[in-house]
């Protein structure tokens, strides 16, 4: 019997999301206009809290849908205007171009990245060295590429290796990777160990993207927003953030080493010998079948990667345009000429790009309703040294439960407003920009909500295969969260100001 129109409409609304989630969103949409009539300031904060809720519930429904509905309503009832949203999008066009073109460009270099991580996994036998290598490789790549793409590549490697062993162990050429029923007891034990091994590697790589992503203006989308607000190029951004990012990187790598040595928090599991044998045999077969055309494609991707790093380091063009050049060069020299094949590169980035546009709509509400003005006034009443720590902590707290791009955008806008109003000087603003950048990037590893790369991992096809749940991810990230947050705070408090002053004294950094 066919369902009623009312039931069909309810099922269509937000699709497979739970009924309680749909009811909650409807309640938000009904309450907001009523509160806005009587208390616009309170309604603005309510909207921000609701939007953070949609980000936290990203596994129930992709935040673009509920967040977008909230943003549309905010414009309709007058919390902000379409013109203000357009201005915010225009101001942050470089970030949108970064996501559209850079992520798509790196898609055409996946073969090279897959080759790098495959060689690491099979050529290094020590789990500690392998973990450090994965963390280091992810950090280096994320400093120049998009963290989402780096994680996507590592996920591809892990799913590929998992599938190879699972098919051999279950003696099936086309089996369901979720189905373990055809495995005997011994093979199931080996598979469980392999899952634990992959979980630890994925978490090391995920944290590596945060360690590298904080260092450069292209490492994370919010970095570019902050760099533009401060007027920094690629080199200046790296130098200004270095007094915090470099010590944090060293301590992060040390944490990786200690976790593998102590075998705590789910780390330290070795790659089973039976799995290594299967993977090694498969790799030998694949390498022997690699054609000259495929080898040349790898070389071309390596050269394009060198061009990417060179162009970014010397700021030869806007980041998004460099990404566009990567798309053109990579497709031209690897033989990808079909429109549909090129189109696949954009499917990864465009949903998040659209979500970022919604972020900026919420930022427009925050600006028009002056929501953060009381917080900023409170922070600016503190001493200059304390301001840095407070900005870092406020950013870190919000970034651990919400998306760090959103948080970074909000706080750098407020700091810029304080600069323009004369509440702070240019030197203090630049120090605050570093505190905001590190505050949004480092503590956000606490939960998948804060880091887009972590959320991407949690919602990927790999997560259920290796039994990586939300709770387990938070638990495995905990030691990194504590170390990165505390070391970052100490560096902001004690090393940032003297290091920056020293760079200015010797003429490496110019006073603005």
Swiss-Prot record:
Stretches that traverse the bilayer: 28-48, 52-72, 97-117, 144-164, 201-221, 237-257, 296-330, 347-367, 390-410, 446-466, 474-494
GO molecular function: sodium:proton antiporter activity
InterPro entries: Na+/H+_antiporter_NhaB
The reaction(s) this protein catalyses: 2 Na(+)(in) + 3 H(+)(out) = 2 Na(+)(out) + 3 H(+)(in)
Membrane topology: Multi-pass membrane protein
Keywords: Antiport, Cell inner membrane, Cell membrane, Ion transport, Membrane, Sodium, Sodium transport, Transmembrane, Transmembrane helix, Transport
Cleavable signal peptide: none
Domain of life: Bacteria
Entry's localization field: Cell inner membrane
Pfam families: NhaB
GO cellular component: plasma membrane
Function: Na(+)/H(+) antiporter that extrudes sodium in exchange for external protons.
PANTHER family recorded: NA(+)_H(+) ANTIPORTER NHAB, TRANSPORTER ARSB-RELATED
UniProt-listed HAMAP family: NhaB
Family to which the UniProt record says this protein belongs: Belongs to the NhaB Na(+)/H(+) (TC 2.A.34) antiporter family.
Name listed for the protein in its UniProt record: Na(+)/H(+) antiporter NhaB
Species in which this protein is naturally found: Enterobacter sp. (strain 638)
Name of the gene this protein is made from: nhaB
């Amino acid at each position: 019997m066919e369902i009623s129109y009312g039931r069909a409409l309810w099922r269509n609304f937000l699709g497979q999301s739970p009924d309680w989630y749909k009811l909650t969103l409807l309640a938000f949409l009904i309450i907001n206009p009523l509160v806005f009539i009587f208390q616009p300031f309170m309604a603005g904060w309510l909207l921000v809290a609701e939007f953070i809720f949609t980000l936290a519930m990203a596994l129930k429904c992709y935040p673009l849908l509920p967040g977008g509905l909230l943003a549309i309503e905010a414009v309709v009832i007058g919390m902000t205007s379409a013109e203000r949203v357009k201005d915010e999008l225009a101001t942050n066009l470089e970030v949108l171009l970064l996501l559209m073109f850079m992520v798509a460009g790196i898609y055409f270099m996946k073969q090279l990245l897959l080759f790098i991580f495959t060689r690491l996994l099979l050529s290094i036998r020590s789990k500690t060295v392998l973990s450090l290598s994965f963390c280091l490789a992810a950090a280096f790549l994320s400093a120049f590429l998009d963290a989402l793409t780096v994680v996507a590549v590592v996920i591809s490697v892990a799913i590929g290796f998992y599938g190879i062993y699972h098919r051999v162990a279950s003696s099936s050429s086309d089996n369901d990777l979720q189905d373990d029923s055809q495995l005997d007891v011994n093979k199931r034990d080996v598979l469980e160990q392999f899952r634990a091994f992959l979980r630890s590697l994925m978490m090391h790589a995920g944290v590596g993207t945060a360690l590298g992503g904080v260092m450069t203006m292209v490492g994370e989308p919010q970095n570019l927003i902050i760099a533009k607000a401060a007027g920094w190029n690629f080199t200046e951004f790296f130098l200004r953030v270095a007094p915090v990012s470099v010590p944090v990187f060293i301590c992060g790598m040390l944490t990786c080493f200690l976790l593998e040595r102590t075998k705590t928090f789910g780390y330290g599991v070795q790659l089973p010998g039976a799995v290594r044998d299967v993977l090694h045999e498969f790799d030998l077969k694949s390498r022997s079948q690699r054609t000259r055309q495929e080898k040349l494609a790898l070389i071309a991707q390596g050269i394009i990667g060198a061009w990417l790093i060179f162009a970014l380091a010397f700021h030869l063009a806007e980041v998004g345009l460099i990404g566009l050049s990567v798309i053109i060069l990579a497709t031209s020299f690897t033989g990808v000429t079909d429109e549909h094949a090129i189109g696949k590169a954009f499917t990864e980035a465009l949903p998040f790009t659209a979500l970022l546009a919604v972020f900026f709509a919420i930022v427009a509400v925050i600006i028009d309703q002056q929501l953060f003005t009381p917080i900023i006034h409170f922070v600016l009443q503190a001493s200059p040294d304390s301001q840095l720590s407070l900005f870092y902590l406020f950013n870190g707290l919000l970034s651990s439960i919400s998306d760090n791009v959103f948080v970074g955008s909000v706080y750098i806008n407020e700091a810029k407003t304080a600069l323009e109003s004369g509440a702070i000087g240019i030197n203090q603003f630049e120090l605050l920009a570093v505190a905001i950048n590190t505050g949004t990037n480092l503590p956000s590893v606490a939960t998948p909500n804060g880091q887009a790369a972590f959320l991407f991992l949690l919602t990927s096809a790999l997560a259920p295969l290796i039994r990586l749940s939300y709770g387990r991810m938070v638990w495995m990230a905990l030691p990194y969260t504590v170390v990165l947050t505390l070391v970052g705070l100490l560096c902001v408090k004690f090393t940032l100001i003297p290091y920056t002053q020293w760079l200015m004294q010797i003429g490496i950094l110019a006073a603005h």
